[in-house]
């Protein structure tokens, strides 16, 4: 459960990263595909090379979904309900991949905003990403 401080910390760090949605989203995906190559299996039709238009486009979708969750931080499940349905029922993404993506996103944020990612902000952002992952996997059966 996100505390008031967590919500403030998450909103604060996203105010710094929102304008870089496509860049950070693509970087996160590229990092995940390299670090955890098994995640590539969900993207057989993608050009997975650095800088590909498909990675940039999907990275922007990922980042925009996170921004949507931040904008509705008191109702993440409502904000991401359709995305949860898509991943659980149509795409059938292994739930562990959301944790891997979250870890890669944390690394990208740390690279670009090292002074802003204090231990407290890191903890809050990690809790937020876990909450998003829980919402996205809530409809799995």
From Swiss-Prot:
Q: Name one GO cellular component term.
A: blood microparticle
Instruction: Identify the keywords attached in UniProt to this record, alphabetized.
Output: Heme, Iron, Metal-binding, Oxygen transport, Transport
UniProt-annotated binding residues for heme b: 87
In terms of InterPro entries, this protein maps to:
Globin, Globin-like_sf, Globin/Proto, Hemoglobin_a-typ, Hemoglobin_oxygen_transport, Hemoglobin_pi
Q: In which tissues is it expressed?
A: Red blood cells.
Q: Which superkingdom heads the taxonomic lineage of this protein's source?
A: Eukaryota
Any single GO molecular-function term of the entry would be:
oxygen carrier activity
Listed binding positions for O2 are 58
Globin domain location is 1-141
| Biological processes, Gene Ontology terms | hydrogen peroxide catabolic process
Pfam short name (any one) = Globin
* Assigned protein family: Belongs to the globin family.
Question: Its quaternary structure?
Answer: Heterotetramer of two alpha chains and two beta chains.
Q: Briefly, what is this protein's role? A: Involved in oxygen transport from the lung to the various peripheral tissues.
Q: Which PANTHER family match?
A: HEMOGLOBIN FAMILY MEMBER, HEMOGLOBIN SUBUNIT ALPHA
Record protein name field: Hemoglobin subunit alpha-A
Q: What is the lineage of its organism?
A: Eukaryota, Metazoa, Chordata, Craniata, Vertebrata
- The UniProt gene name for this protein comes to HBAA
